[in-house]
């Protein structure tokens, strides 16, 4: 696992965006062999998306031959709802870049058969040869996508009931009314994420410090699903200083030292 420690959220976002852009450019994708990108929602990736939009508008990276698969979607929330993840992606990312609409994939939380929708999603990922780079964020309890504590580390795309903690956390997007927050979701599984050729997770803020500790120094356990990243041969966590508050001093210094030559985001595109 690589741990890239940046001073603040803006630096985290810039590094992550430049890393994604560099991976897309290096792959030299074509319509026949596109670059397949896994996309998260929430507050963590917003800065990265803004930076990627800027790189796209400057002509540094193109998304014309990129196919995306989103991590999750609420069940029962109309896709036109301002808090649906469909709306989130189009408002904050897709509508600002040169991606083809037909190349974007988001789970349908209003499908007549939710199990069939999840199976279809997994099959479509396979049809593209898997995901090249899965981006993500985590919750304070270490969950990836909507894989709450206790989720199987080999799980695939399925329907999940949200925990009370997640519902309360997400109520900030629903007028702080927990009754407006959907209680279930469709989500890729931990196994789906780990099947990607590379995984990059953004962690920022003091409230994620305990989760980062479990991700880097803790045991691999379903109670902290982010800990499964330790098993991935190409896992990267990009974090800010605030999120490292619970890491051992030795761990912090170790990763700062070995990644010292890779902390400038501009160098990633050279």
Swiss-Prot record:
Keywords: Allosteric enzyme, Carbohydrate metabolism, Hydrolase. The keyword Hydrolase applies. PANTHER family: GLUCOSAMINE-6-PHOSPHATE ISOMERASE. Catalyzes the reversible isomerization-deamination of glucosamine 6-phosphate (GlcN6P) to form fructose 6-phosphate (Fru6P) and ammonium ion. It catalyses: alpha-D-glucosamine 6-phosphate + H2O = beta-D-fructose 6-phosphate + NH4(+). The gene is nagB. It comes from the Bacteria. One of its GO terms (molecular function) is identical protein binding. InterPro entries: Glc/Gal-6P_isomerase (IPR006148), Glucosamine6P_isomerase (IPR004547), Glucosamine6P_isomerase_CS (IPR018321), NagB/RpiA_transferase-like (IPR037171). One of its GO terms (cellular component) is cytoplasm. Allosterically activated by N-acetylglucosamine 6-phosphate (GlcNAc6P). The active site is at residues 72, 141, 143, 148. It is an enzyme of class 3 (hydrolase). This is Glucosamine-6-phosphate deaminase. Belongs to the glucosamine/galactosamine-6-phosphate isomerase family. NagB subfamily. Pathway: Amino-sugar metabolism; N-acetylneuraminate degradation; D-fructose 6-phosphate from N-acetylneuraminate: step 5/5. GO terms for biological process: carbohydrate metabolic process; glucosamine catabolic process; N-acetylglucosamine catabolic process; N-acetylneuraminate catabolic process. The record marks 151, 158, 160-161, 254 as: Part of the allosteric site. HAMAP family: GlcN6P_deamin (MF_01241). Its EC number is 3.5.99.6.
